[in-house]
Amino acid sequence: MNKIKCALIGPGNIGTDLLYKLKRSPVLEPVWMVGIDAASEGLARARELGLKTTADGVDGLLPHVKADGVQIAFDATSAYVHAENSRKLNELGVLMIDLTPAAIGPFCVPPVNLKDHVGRGEMNVNMVTCGGQATIPMVAAVSRVQPVKYGEIVATVSSKSAGPGTRKNIDEFTRTTAGAVEKVGGAKVGKAIIILNPAEPPLIMRDTVHCLTETEPDQQKITESIHAMIREVQKYVPGYKLVNGPVFDGNRVSIYLEVEGLGDYLPKYAGNLDIMTAAGARTAEMFAEEILAGRLTLESNRAVLA
């Protein structure tokens, strides 16, 4: 079967974990890994897996995009460089899946709004953040039952799973996640907090979601909605679990989650990376299926719907 060829930018924790997932994909074929350090472990690992590599950043990839048929690129670098990376690749008709908190394209949380983006012919979609991917489905599960006036999420991840890129982008993480809690989750006001826990052995990713509903919460409907949404997320992140809740206290609905990774590249405690890379891969697969079916054509700076 034909596969859509992909490039990965950023051979760090997220880029490397994503590479393993793309290797299993029925519709995506990773062919390039882009970095900036010739001695990086991630580039060496990509070469071992048969990918072409460059240590000259995106500029090292551009001359090969057309020849190697690259149609989708994943950016797992940093919010600071993403806009330029996206501009250069969009011009060549490459669809960009943004795994940084840059958020220049629309937010995408697969179980909530992935289908909308595929039908709009976007050239850049943003995967929010790991905390956003884990918690926004829960905010959306409450807000689809009744209006949420405030949504707050707290993502706790092990220090070991947060590489230099994540640490550089902490402020962007909180801003981008809070924005997506509102735009995708449906809360009128959103707030996001990230905690890096240095405990050894490293702790699994844990997330807490608090929603304040405008009227008294319909406990049965909200509980059913949350359980249905958990099942949707588990389709691509099997280690996504409801640990406690929903707990109702007046108008507050609290949900406690745990995310265990598949252990593709980093150990299973790094569910924060896993949910991000799984969501990115799921999103790209959805676009790839549309391209393969002839319903979507990528051109310079635009995606044309059939």
From Swiss-Prot:
Its EC number is 1.2.1.10. Belongs to the acetaldehyde dehydrogenase family. It holds the Pfam family AcetDehyd-dimer. The keyword NAD applies. The active site is at C130. This is Acetaldehyde dehydrogenase 2/3. NCBIfam families: ac_ald_DH_ac (TIGR03215), PRK08300.1 (NF006157). Keywords: Aromatic hydrocarbons catabolism, NAD, Oxidoreductase. GO terms for biological process: catabolic process. It is an enzyme of class 1 (oxidoreductase). CDD domains: ALDH_C (cd23933). The keyword NAD applies. One of its GO terms (molecular function) is acetaldehyde dehydrogenase (acetylating) activity. It catalyses: acetaldehyde + NAD(+) + CoA = acetyl-CoA + NADH + H(+).
